[in-house]
UniProtKB/Swiss-Prot annotation:
Tissue: Mostly expressed in inflorescence bolts. Also present in roots, stems, germinated seeds, cotyledons, pollen, stamen and stigma.
Organism: Arabidopsis thaliana
EC number: 2.7.11.1
Record-listed Phosphothreonine modification sites: T273, T442, T447
Gene inactivation effect: Decreased sensitivity to ABA with respect to seed germination, seedling growth and primary root tip elongation. Impaired cytoplasmic Ca(2+) accumulation in response to ABA.
InterPro entries per record: Kinase-like_dom_sf, PERK1-13-like, Prot_kinase_dom, Protein_kinase_ATP_BS, Ser/Thr_kinase_AS
Record's protein name: Proline-rich receptor-like protein kinase PERK4
Reaction it catalyzes: L-seryl-[protein] + ATP = O-phospho-L-seryl-[protein] + ADP + H(+); L-threonyl-[protein] + ATP = O-phospho-L-threonyl-[protein] + ADP + H(+)
Compositionally biased intervals (Gly residues): 77-90, 136-145
Sample GO molecular function, one term: protein serine kinase activity
Any coiled-coil regions, as ranges: none
Stretches that traverse the bilayer: 152-172
Length: 633
């Protein structure tokens, strides 16, 4: 009995250091509990002392629960055994396991201990240590991975941006090279005097706009000589030049010498052989003859694709070489507009030159306006035709590069579709059939009654000459009379007859004396006033005083005031039709004398008989004449 009290204090002393180890566990002194942990197994042989020793440490028992409260997982481990001290020891071991430093003691205990109490502490420590350590490592790894992912994303974005910039630069350079190679500067010299006086640099800069604009307009064309845009060329065809657009493809003829810069593009349309056009027109029979005039004969044809065309055979002896002819046709073939007849192709065979146009099925304005036994054309239809023709001419004068002067505006060259929409034909033919050696040709360009005064005096034609001819055509639509009519005296033309009537009508607003009697007053006075004002401004003697075609378009549409065309001069004033000074005014007497002179020259060299064929697209200039003047003595 005496030995038991002596042995009890040592157990208390050995057990007493364990609570301080709990308090010191927070100060990272976990090695203290590890040496006494083997002592309980030594006194494990007697199970009685532990129950006696439970009473003294009772006041210190709350400390382990505090540590166990911080880590609730150890009670579940300690609760698995029946030994209270073993559970406390396990609880004492768990607080050090909360931090990273306690892990080495747990390993040393696992190495030194063979007791039963140490494995729970070790296992508890190992279980509690692993999650924090794994959590710490995973947290560090997650931060590293996020930084790596961010760097990868930034690198990809920067690389993509640089790639896009490089692609844009390459595309811009290729596009610039393509433009430079596809649109060379036009020929220098006087070869393009017919096409306005554009600067070569401006023409080369504006050429792409014209090219793009013409493509868009071609898609809108519906009523041409056979319908919409150009048809695919009939087989067999010559090898193409390989340009990007199938609609602008054509052969490069190897038999020719090296072409000039303007011909380097190749021809835009199709080339036809004489046999192909002969088969299309039935051998150029009279049954397919649409008309004839100063430029030659016009036959209707059908291509193997089923497309209807109008084949115009130009008369021989124009004085132009083959290369020059191709250059001029190349320019004309690029022109596409809703109110212009498009060129489909051409043919050169043993000096014979033919042009292939779209076929317009509803004949000409001349036919419907002056034909016999035909219904009277309504005034609204006349206004629509006048507006369409004005838009087509405005495109030739102001939107084409180089600009194109028609030179032969007249009612016979205004073709109509079944909706009575106007389409201007034969633009550029005056250049194709003129002598290329001199600007002023002995052959009369234009049509009597439509010629501008400056052409009669100087032999030169400009855009304002086309405006004058358009004004004469407006008078035809207003009055229903021809430019040179049998009902008018020989020395008076439609212009001379209408000038005083227009002045009075614009002053008092009464157009009955001027308007076509067949209309019987069925017209809109405001629309009639617009047409009369445009006609009066267009036929002024001075070309400088005539408006542009774009101004006429806006005036006919009612978008601008009519006073803008009068330039501040009252409509009834004589200066509206003349120049500012009497000395510079080209007198009507001189004009009539020059017209007689030109008529004599033209009639003396007449090669084609006057034709009244209804379907012609370009009647001869002399078709409008009523009488032949007395030959000069």
């Amino acid at each position: 009995m005496a030995s038991s009290p002596e042995s009890a204090p040592p157990t208390n002393s050995t057990s007493s250091p364990s609570p301080p180890s709990n308090t010191n566990s927070t100060t990272s002194s976990p090695p203290a509990p590890s040496p006494p942990s083997p002592t309980p197994p030594q006194g494990d042989s007697s199970s009685s002392p532990p129950p006696d020793s439970t009473s003294p440490p009772a006041p210190q028992a709350p400390n382990p629960p505090n540590s166990s409260n911080n880590s609730p997982s150890p009670p579940s481990q300690g609760g698995g055994g029946e030994r209270g001290n073993g559970g406390n020891n396990g609880g004492n071991d768990t607080p050090p396991s909360r931090g990273s430093p306690p892990s080495p003691p747990s390993r040393s205990n696992g190495d030194n201990g063979g007791s039963r109490s140490s494995p729970p502490g070790d296992t508890g420590g190992s279980r509690s240590d692993n999650p924090p350590s794994s959590g710490g490592s995973s947290g560090g790894g997650g931060g590293g991975r996020s930084n790596t992912n961010t760097a990868i994303i930034v690198g990809v974005l920067v690389g993509a941006g640089l790639l896009m910039i490089v692609l844009i630069i390459v595309c811009l350079r290729r596009k610039k090279k393509r433009k430079d190679s596809f649109y060379p500067e036009p020929m220098k010299g006087n070869q393009y005097q017919y096409y306005g006086n554009n600067n070569n640099n401006n023409a080369s800069q504006n050429y792409p706009n014209w090219h793009l604009n013409s493509q868009g307009q071609n898609q809108q064309s519906t009523g041409g000589w056979g319908g919409g845009g150009p048809s695919p060329p009939p087989p067999p065809r010559m090898p193409t030049s390989g340009e990007d657009s199938s609609m602008y493809s054509g052969p490069s003829r190897p038999v020719l010498p090296p072409p000039s810069p303007a011909l380097a593009l190749g021809f835009n349309k199709s080339t036809f052989t004489y046999q192909e056009l002969a088969a299309a027109t039935g051998g150029f029979t009279d049954a397919n003859l649409l008309g004839q005039g100063g430029f030659g004969y016009v036959h209707k044809g059908v291509l193997p694709s089923g497309k209807e065309v109008a084949v115009k055979s130009l008369k021989a002896g124009s004085g132009q070489g083959e290369r020059e002819f191709q250059a001029e046709v190349d320019i004309i073939s690029r022109v596409h507009h809703r109110y212009l007849v498009s060129l489909v192709g051409y043919c050169i065979a043993d000096g014979q030159r033919m042009l292939v146009y779209e076929f317009v099925p509803n004949k000409t304005l001349e036919y419907h306006l002056h034909g016999k036994n035909l219904p009277v054309m309504e005034f609204s239809t006349r206004l629509r035709i006048a507006l369409g023709a004005a838009k087509g001419l405005a495109y030739l004068h102001e939107d084409c590069h180089p600009r194109i002067i028609h030179r032969d505006i007249k009612s016979a060259n205004i073709l109509l579709d079944f909706n009575f929409d106007a389409m201007v034909a034969d633009f550029g033919l005056a250049k194709l059939t003129s002598d290329n050696n001199t600007h002023v040709s002995t052959r009369v360009m234009g049509t009597f009654g439509y010629l501008a005064p400056e052409y009669a005096s100087s032999g030169k034609l400009t855009e304002k000459s086309d405006v004058f001819s358009y004004g004469v055509m407006l008078l035809e639509l207003i009055t229903g009379k021809r430019p040179v009519d049998n009902s008018i005296t020989m020395d008076d033309t439609l212009v001379d007859w209408a000038r005083p009537l227009m002045a009075r009508a614009l002053e008092d607003g009464n157009f009955n004396e001027l308007a076509d009697a067949r209309l019987e007053g069925n017209y809109n006075p405001q629309e009639m006033a617009r047409m009369v004002t445009c006609a009066a401004a267009s036929i002024r003697h001075s070309g400088r005083k005539r408006p542009k075609m774009s101004q006429i378009v806006r005036a006919l549409e009612g978008e601008v005031s009519l006073d803008a065309l009068n330039e501040g001069v009252k409509p009834g004033h004589s200066n509206v039709y003349g120049s500012l000074g009497a000395s510079s005014d080209y007198s009507q007497t001189s004009y009539n004398a020059d017209m007689k002179k030109f008529r004599q020259i033209a009639l003396s060299s007449q090669e084609f008989p006057v034709s009244d064929c209804e379907g012609t697209s370009s009647n001869d200039s002399r078709d409008m004449g009523t009488k032949s003047p007395t030959p000069p003595k």
